[in-house]
Structure formats: C-alpha cells, structure tokens
Amino acid sequence: MFSKFKAKDKVIVNGIGKCNGKEYINQTAIVINRDPFFLDYNVRFEDGTEDWLEEECLRKFKGE
C-alpha cells in the first residue's frame, strides 16, 4: 500500500497522539516509520519524544 509520508520526512502534526492522548498543535516532527497493520505513523518530535498518529493528523513540512 502507498505511504503518503516516507521515513525521515519532516511533518507538521495537528491532532491527538495514541500513546498518551496528548494534543499536538502545529508541532514539527520526523517520521520514523509506518505501522503496516494499523496504518498509523510513529513520529519523533524535536524534544525527543515519540508518539503514534493517524495520517489525517500529519501534513508535509514546507520551508527550511
């Protein structure tokens, strides 16, 4: 199946994480990988924390 985001892509996160229910608003993160069964993404934030999010919560980072 097609992955919208590849590993090491920089993304902007707007949504609620699945690990601890934290809400992220306009946070930048790096995609680590995609779960092939649940089809959600594991991302690492700038502070080093990681969380799982659905594809709808992510969009490509433009800039830099």
Where is each model-derived feature located?
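Basic/aromatic-rich interaction segments and small domains that mediate binding to polyanionic partners
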Residues: 2-64
